[in-house]
């Protein structure tokens, strides 16, 4: 793979990259979806309050087209009449139509931009770069946005033209209908016009959802080197991690070896395995493993045992099973009670021999070890 190919952003963004993107304010923003929701809530509000809207419209028309000579003779009356029309009717009408839409816009803004970042309001000299501006103008995203905008404008214009030519003109220029009928008819026609536009926008918005999601993840794609560097930064350099594991393992081993001197017996396979066991019948319900190791660690355990005159028992099978079936700091499993009991009985005989003297206790050679434990031990070694 050549250098150019290795630098291509072909990898999906990691969870850390997505988190950083959210913190810096680069979120998915479904502009078309929020436009649809605002239009929907406005349309529902319009239909729900249509009686009140009609009443306010009638009052506005009545006050506007009613001639009262006394009003025009006094400027104060004229101003008062205008304010009355504006305050009592027009503001109420605008509030009914637009206030629910404004209320709905704030949750939409909060949902899409839950993290407010003031970095975007800082001055950036790169924004004045004409080359970058030219690239943004002719980017795929800009072309798609332009296409969607043109498509919406064309359709809305066609729908509005058809509704005006088919419904409004024949009613507005006819003298056979009353004013109330024309007003009611106009409100219903406006509602149907907006509903038609809303229905048409649905497939556009569904396509836009998939496009915005694809474009968002595409903009966050990473090169393989970026993914590798990010993993190193998050999890650490593999060499450093290996060194840390070695240090932790060394500390754990030193702590474990410090407990060998407290053990009652060490079971060994002469060359490879060593397991230190302790049992205190007053505060232990079973023998406990204080230390275990193989190769160099086993040699250290045996050396510490010799320095502290701890009895050492050689048993190939028992050493293997104890090493693979137990953990340091834990009690031995119940299936090994009988075998370990023989070892501890031998240890107690040695202690008695040291006090009373006599013949040195015979070292046990055969131990009861369930066959399934021995088979598991062989498989684990393999």
Curated annotation (Swiss-Prot):
Gene3D superfamilies: 6.10.250.2080, secretion proteins EscU (3.40.1690.10). The keyword Transport applies. GO terms for biological process: bacterial-type flagellum organization; protein secretion. It is found in: Cell membrane. It holds the Pfam family Bac_export_2. Keywords: Bacterial flagellum biogenesis, Bacterial flagellum protein export, Cell membrane, Membrane, Protein transport, Transmembrane, Transmembrane helix, Transport. It is a multi-pass membrane protein. GO terms for cellular component: plasma membrane. InterPro entries: T3SS_substrate_exporter, T3SS_substrate_exporter_C. The keyword Coiled coil does not apply. The chain crosses the membrane at residues 33-55, 90-112, 150-169, 189-211. Required for formation of the rod structure in the basal body of the flagellar apparatus. Together with FliI and FliH, may constitute the export apparatus of flagellin. This is Flagellar biosynthetic protein FlhB. The lineage of its organism: Bacteria, Pseudomonadati, Pseudomonadota, Gammaproteobacteria, Enterobacterales.
